[in-house]
A protein has these predicted regions:
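Extracellular, repeat-based ectodomains that mediate carbohydrate processing or recognition
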Residues: 1-433
């Protein structure tokens, strides 16, 4: 819990970091926080600021000039900070173009030194690039959705100068898979510290025929692991054996008949946790938040955490009428992390969510004292009257976040798939000074 009475409100005006992009906010090794975002004018920006010291000047740089292709809030950019301090930002249109663009800084931690814009051309429309550094192999890994229902993997051995040919690791049709959400995790190994990529995937809540959330892991060498760590025959680098068979993945949640689900969060730290919202289509009263945790060889769904209260865009008819406020998992260990000394039973989980009760919109934190079986309200971080056409959505926890800035969210008017939205990225920062 951070001290709201000591915290100051900070805003990034007209900033949106929505949708299936991880990582998009990172606390770098230099102690500064970097957030990549898209504006309602379709501009791609990076913000740099210090969440520890209020006297440190902040900086902001625009990487892409106004482009209506990017005005859709689904075009939030993906951020990657390499081990050597160079910063990479990747951005695409929302299924509008066959091109993916990116820029990399020439100097470490210097957002004023972004080099030229690079472009990767795909065979079909590309969306939702998710970019990470694999420090073991000294590679940049890129996951992206192609043709709306296929996911491809590429890697670069020379910091983005050249890229491998793509391998398809997920394939579906219009009634199947749409969304793949992956988080890089730092894990203990017999040799010290390792990396793995924990993911969850599912289909569109309205369009898909299978409303099941599934999970898996890629290790640092590209092998697909089951949730209990067993290696399968699937490998991202083997074009003949790169495709995941959905039925072989672990099931996190299978919707009861007549209901559907939205995947909301994949935890970047242990234990394995996935956040979701279950509901009946067109029934706002039915939306319930849950957190699933992997324990003793199986996924266990929590008791209901809270009711979402309403959809973000209930009057739209393009699929976005199923969007809800959102959830994010705390980044940390200790009081609200996984404490192996006591079995993880004391405040072992913390999560953030946004919801409404019809009268107010809330940003709240919840904590579990029983290894994720149930959650109780810990703190109301933000509360806004419902009558101002202002909503709260998409809580986001920066990678490596400290408690000076444990979470930020979006606040403003919401309109999906267009440039008609207008919101700020809002946060409460508890500075040290």
């Amino acid at each position: 819990m951070f001290l709201i009475d000591r915290a100051r409100e900070v805003r990034i005006k007209r900033a949106n970091t929505d949708w299936w992009i991880n990582e998009k906010a990172i606390v770098a090794s230099n102690g500064l926080t970097y957030i990549a975002y898209v504006t309602d004018m379709g501009e791609i920006h990076v913000k740099e600021f210090d969440a520890k010291c209020s006297r440190t000047p902040s900086r902001d740089v625009r990487l892409c000039r106004m482009n209506c292709t990017y005005a859709d809030e689904h075009n939030a950019p993906s951020l990657c900070i390499l081990e050597n301090g160079r910063i990479m930002v990747t951005y695409t249109g929302h299924a509008q173009t066959h091109t993916l663009n990116y820029r990399i800084t020439e100097r470490p931690y210097d957002i004023m030194s972004f080099g030229k814009e690079y472009c990767i051309t795909y065979e079909n429309n590309v969306t939702y690039a998710q970019v990470f550094e694999n420090t073991k192999r000294h590679e940049i890994w890129m996951f992206a959705r192609v043709k709306s229902v296929t996911w491809e993997f590429r890697y670069s051995k020379d910091e983005g100068e050249t890229w491998s040919e793509p391998t398809t690791f997920l394939k579906s049709d219009a009634g199947g898979l749409f969304y793949f959400d992956v988080r890089k995790q730092i894990i203990p190994t017999t040799d010290g510290i390792g990396e793995q990529w924990f993911f969850a995937l599912y289909g569109h809540p309205r369009i898909s025929s299978d409303h099941t959330v599934r999970s898996g892991i890629f290790d640092a060498d590209g092998w697909l692991l089951t949730q209990d760590g067993k290696r399968t025959e699937v490998n991202l680098f083997d074009s003949d054996n790169s495709e995941i068979q959905l039925e072989k993945l672990d099931k996190v949640y299978q919707s009861p008949e007549g209901t559907t689900v939205r995947l909301l969060a994949v935890s970047p730290v242990m234990p394995y946790r996935i956040g979701l919202a279950a509901f009946t289509l067109d029934n706002a009263d039915s939306i319930v938040y849950y957190a699933a945790e992997y324990n003793c060889g199986k996924w266990v769904l929590s008791e209901p955490v809270a009711k979402a209260g309403d959809f973000l865009a209930p009057n739209q008819t393009d699929g976005s009428q199923t969007y809800v406020g959102g959830m994010a998992f705390y980044y940390g260990v200790g009081e609200a992390g996984f404490n192996s000394a006591d079995g993880g039973v004391i405040d072992s989980n913390r999560l953030y969510l946004s919801r409404t009760d019809g009268e107010y919109w809330y940003m709240e934190s919840y904590v579990s004292h029983d290894c994720g079986k149930s959650y109780e309200l810990e703190q109301i971080i933000r509360k806004i009257p419902n009558g101002k056409n202002i909503k709260i959505w998409r809580p986001t926890v920066p990678v490596y976040a400290q408690d000076n800035l444990p979470v930020y969210w979006h606040e403003g008017s919401y309109s999906a798939h267009t440039g008609g939205w207008n919101c700020d990225a809002v946060m409460l920062v508890e500075y040290d000074d």
